[in-house]
Amino acid sequence: MALRHKSAQKRHRQSLKRRLINRSRKNTIKTFSKKAVVAAQNGAENAVELHRKAESLIDKAAKGSTLHKNAAARKKSRLAKALNKAKAAQAAQPA
């Protein structure tokens, strides 16, 4: 890639740096979301805490424009739906 102008070179460096930061944040969100769902399905005590942490990470990513606000809302909604489904399944099972 032939970037001839200094400003273009700098913007390219900055975009690569931002890309790494954004990828890291998105991977962390995915990890905590999966952990929260698995914990809820297994009936773990820390499922609510993991859910809260995942939602917090999603909100922070949306605030910093790593995620679009609508994408963040969608992720939070789907996470809550999955956790509620897991809780309902746990409650339906005989003890």
UniProtKB/Swiss-Prot annotation:
The keyword rRNA-binding applies. GO terms for biological process: translation. It comes from the Bacteria. Signal peptide: none annotated. Residues 80-95 have a biased composition (Low complexity). SUPFAM superfamilies: Ribosomal protein S20 (SSF46992). Residues 1-26, 76-95 are annotated as: Disordered. It holds the Pfam family Ribosomal_S20p. One of its GO terms (molecular function) is structural constituent of ribosome. Keywords: Ribonucleoprotein, Ribosomal protein, RNA-binding, rRNA-binding. The keyword S-adenosyl-L-methionine does not apply. GO terms for cellular component: small ribosomal subunit. PANTHER family: 30S RIBOSOMAL PROTEIN S20 (PTHR33398), SMALL RIBOSOMAL SUBUNIT PROTEIN BS20C (PTHR33398:SF1). Binds directly to 16S ribosomal RNA. NCBIfam families: S20. Belongs to the bacterial ribosomal protein bS20 family. This is Small ribosomal subunit protein bS20. It comes from Deinococcus geothermalis (strain DSM 11300 / CIP 105573 / AG-3a).
